[in-house]
């Protein structure tokens, strides 16, 4: 977590109070959630998206290179107690968490959390492949449908999830399918990293640094550059799950 994270959050909260922005969402791995949950509630965060790929301690420790699942769950439950809306994002990984799909659905239903299952994307080390990890979302849909039923619902967010409900109470499940069901034509996302680098697409390296504009008060130039780059967003990504990574950049660098 950046040392000045709360300063940024306070700034965004003021913008929200002035109605310059309508919502504040936070995406996190949850490791610092217990510490910051009260601040997130105080400064108007509308929803917390928590990346959580396993509910089994040993698996979580492995996939996060030493993370403590108990601490993350404590943070999530504290945020829930404070009234924050929580959405769990789970990347589907073959032979790793495909045996947890049902238990994750049940846990989210019990705690009234929204849930999205996401296909793994070929990003990261250029000479690595995600082929052995890939599971299409339809596999997860079939598993859930057989156990709990699955019906599409007319619910949309600003993101790419397609939502369904099950026979369980408090159960709303989204599926994000960048590989098997490309949604690039409806993508409305841009990303600015913590180091000030603008990216128009997760699947392309095209970028520019916004810091020189901000540091020299070239705000109008920056606005024009942002408009230009948004207009020039690529038509689609070129992810191929049976090939090597498309970009040499990890998701935690860009922001999910």
Model feature map: region roles:
Residues 1-118:
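Radical SAM/AdoMet-radical enzyme domain recognition
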Residues 106, 110, 120-256:
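Auxiliary Fe-S-binding modules of radical SAM enzymes
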